[in-house]
Amino acid sequence: TDKGKFYFIKTKSKEILAKDLLVKIILNSIGSLSWRKSMKWADKSLLWGRPLRNIFAIFNKKILLFSFGHLKSSNSIIVEQDLITKYKKIISFKEYQIFLKKNNIILDQDERERKILKKFQLICKSKNYRENFNKQLLEEVVNIVENPHVLLVDFNKDYLQIPQEIIISTLQRHQRYFPLFDNK
């Protein structure tokens, strides 16, 4: 060409199956997660933010086979509620969503956040409270609950002698509470 010589090479791309790529991505992803506090489950050596008992992994209605620590992937999920453990074999994402919904688990984190915010707005409006919302705490709570419920509780007024900043910090950091304020 008038811009000079060009060189090129024709190569055949290595074929990789989507399921193999997914397994690689999943293992890299869960292996790279780090937690401020980790724990073990039973006598296993795997450290994790919460005890891991199961890895549910399916693609195109088939199990994605891999191991992580002492666990092997499967098409079964475990739900524990009210001291009852439920096991269910799942073959599709739709079936997974239905099973979780039947067990009052909200899969969509945006939906969990909307539920929390809506309840807060209702409480604030009905009691004429104002909020001092902590977005970081909201994000944390949204990600540690399966189905959020918002409760309004009072505490002993003697604690109001403690500086407000200490009360708020304690409620948020140690108990994951969201403080609301009246107009006094």
Task: Annotate the PLM regions.
Residues 1-168, 176:
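Long, basic N-terminal domains or extensions that often function
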Residues 172, 178-184:
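Function-dense linear segments that define catalytic or interfacial modules
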